[in-house]
Amino acid sequence: MTRKQKRLAVIAGGVGFIMVAVLLVLFAFGQSIAYFYMPSDLAKTPVGPGTRIRLGGLVAEGSVKRDTGSTVSFAVTDGTATVPVTYTGILPDLFREGQGVVTEGVFGAGGTLFDADTVLAKHDENYMPKEVADRMKKDGVWKGEGEAK
């Protein structure tokens, strides 16, 4: 093998290695990314059962129901649409009706009940998750005071 052929083989091997590494990184990111949706987004474009997403909005008034165990059922709304949610675990101390919440999980087999494995609640009386507030402002259903922090 000549010097030129060796150099070409090393370059081709390096490019191949980099391509495989990039594909592995993209594959790993694709499995861990959870896209953010509001209930009205899901009403327009439903996602398939088992698809991991983040669902944000307000906890609907009168929707929180606690089972005998640690399972809680509630609904998330954005003023336009509502999505029923179940969560098994300990809720954040600041979780309550009418407050901002972001949940992460998957839709069940029926595609209508959202099974959350993570629930994030607002921090204080003036806070709403930025992505929720921005989307509600964009959709024209924002009823809060001031700007989202």
From Swiss-Prot:
The chain crosses the membrane at residues 8-28. Residues 29-149 are periplasmic. Heme binds at H123, Y127. Keywords: Cell inner membrane, Cell membrane, Cytochrome c-type biogenesis, Heme, Iron, Membrane, Metal-binding, Signal-anchor, Transmembrane, Transmembrane helix. Residues 1-7 are cytoplasmic. InterPro entries: CcmE, CcmE-like_sf, NA-bd_OB-fold. The keyword Metal-binding applies. It is found in: Cell inner membrane. One of its GO terms (biological process) is cytochrome complex assembly. Its main location: membrane. It is a single-pass type II membrane protein. One of its GO terms (cellular component) is plasma membrane. GO terms for molecular function: heme binding; metal ion binding. Pfam families: CcmE (PF03100). Belongs to the CcmE/CycJ family. Heme chaperone required for the biogenesis of c-type cytochromes. Transiently binds heme delivered by CcmC and transfers the heme to apo-cytochromes in a process facilitated by CcmF and CcmH. This is Cytochrome c-type biogenesis protein CcmE. It comes from Allorhizobium ampelinum (strain ATCC BAA-846 / DSM 112012 / S4).
